A protein has these predicted regions:
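Acceptor-substrate binding/catalytic loop of class I
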Residues: 135, 168-184
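A short glycine-rich, Lys/Arg-flanked "PGG" loop and its adjoining helix->strand segment in the class I
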Residues: 142-154
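Conserved beta-strand signature within the Rossmann-like core of class I S-adenosyl-L-methionine
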Residues: 155-162
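A conserved beta-strand element that flanks and buttresses the S-adenosyl-L-methionine
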Residues: 127
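A C-terminal cap/extension of S-adenosyl-L-methionine-dependent methyltransferases
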Residues: 203-264
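Class I SAM-dependent methyltransferase SAM/SAH-binding core
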Residues: 69, 73-115
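Conserved class I S-adenosyl-L-methionine
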Residues: 1-54, 57-64
Length: 264
């Protein structure tokens, strides 16, 4: 999800990539080798694994669910899952894949912009993976966080994984992406009535994030080969060091809960 005109962007991207393989190019990085996106997914899953736990029957909201990769994981673990996304194609594929996985009875998928979210439910877990980094307008970003806080049950937990480096940098920013400084998110969450329970690292190895702006300039074959090599070098470091090298991590997993009531 991103700013007001971005739903068309995500729909075009979904139509092009969502039904290819696992659909990672639709929700991670398109134009990159498959190994690159699989490495991203591995580091994300490693970071989420400690916190993505709940009782059977727990109500889980997956915002910006894409093709439903985290939605299916939650439903397979016994959650009653609601997934939302601005792309009708993404939502359709997520529903289709939940059916083929035999978990359709525990899943519902809705075409919905997070900024305008207004469901009658409150959720034990609200999950968002690389969603806020695509909401560029500050007012819409704050509204999105408030909407999630308002849908979180009183004793619920919120997991938000975003590009959030400790030091400010714009070298990877684009028309649909912003890597905001970590302290910006921390203040935003506090302002929206949330308490930060923990911050976990995701990808502290510097090779990929330092090299990415330059790798994109290489010719096609060289770009794919070099990106795969850099990802392969980064992955062991990311998986091994992420729990401890939090300040060095490009992405961060924020573990949040109510601090006594979110603003209306």
């Amino acid at each position: 999800m991103a700013d007001e005109n971005s739903s068309a962007y995500w729909e075009r991207r979904a139509q092009r990539f969502a039904d290819r393989g696992e659909g990672l190019a639709a929700v991670c990085s398109y134009g990159m080798p498959d190994f690159y996106n699989r490495a991203i997914q591995l580091t994300q899953r490693r970071a989420l694994s400690r916190w993505l736990r709940f009782e059977p029957g727990a109500r889980v909201l997956d915002v910006g669910c894409g093709v439903g990769r985290w939605s299916r994981l939650c439903a397979m673990r016994g959650a009653n899952l609601t997934g939302i996304d601005v792309s009708p194609t993404m939502v359709g594929i997520a529903a289709q894949r939940s059916y083929h996985a035999g978990i359709a009875d525990r899943c519902r998928f809705l075409v919905q912009d997070l900024v305008d979210l207004a469901l009658p439910d409150r959720f034990d877990l609200v999950l968002g993976v690389t969603v806020l980094q695509h909401i560029l307008a500050p007012a819409r970003l704050e509204r999105a966080v408030l909407r999630m806080a308002q849908h979180l049950a009183p004793r619920g937990r919120m997991l938000l994984l975003e590009a959030a480096p400790v030091k400010a940098t714009r070298r990877c920013d684009s028309a649909i992406f912003a890597a905001r400084q970590r302290c910006y998110y921390q203040q935003l969450f506090t302002d929206c009535g949330l308490r930060i329970r923990a911050i976990t690292g995701v990808d502290p190895a510097p090779f990929r994030t330092w090299a990415l702006p330059y790798l994109r300039r290489l010719p096609g074959g060289m770009h794919l080969a070099t990106t795969t090599l850099v990802s392969a070098l980064s992955l062991p470091f990311d998986l091994a060091l992420a729990p401890w090298a939090v300040d060095q991590s490009w992405h961060a997993l924020f573990v949040l809960e109510h601090a006594g009531g979110a603003r209306a």
